[in-house]
């Protein structure tokens, strides 16, 4: 498989399901329903212990935008160090200014810190909330990031094909472009062929029923429209089908 395939997961069951499908890298998160947040240190350790492929930890301290305070940046530094201590291979991060540009002072500090620890760095879909993709691409390249996860500044990668193609052409091999959001086995061939991206990203999510025998109806642990007894997990077949499509 010449095209790298990354799977994002947010629980240990999904780690095993994803690896069984045959991807080349794991993006380790919590709360994928919120776009992916930093996983716990325990989850990082378990992933490092059990994974047979590289694992990159999401470094995102909260949901919402990517304009962070100094305290949040310090928190992210600690989480990067935790990823290293846990034995992971890299981290996934992104930092913006209030006006939608890459926050170069903060991004430089975080990337240099991670790289000094020997960790690879992916710049995540904060890129898709930038005001100027061409400028942002050059800045992320200057940070020494290995890749950018992007939908081409669109709601989904299939909708961002033209921008993805332009970014690949602008990059000229200086950084990998990884297409993500709405990518599946049915459309990945077209996306790769038209854009020439070298990496793709998906969750391959499904749900399974709870193994509980007592289904509590009297309370909710979160939002009223979320079923506490329907567990989101990675679908091994969805990953395997993607691998087949890429081959």
Swiss-Prot record:
It is found in: Cytoplasm. Disulfide bonds: none annotated. Pfam families: CutC (PF03932). One of its GO terms (cellular component) is cytoplasm. Keywords: Cytoplasm. One of its GO terms (molecular function) is copper ion binding. Its main location: cytoplasm. Belongs to the CutC family. This is PF03932 family protein CutC.
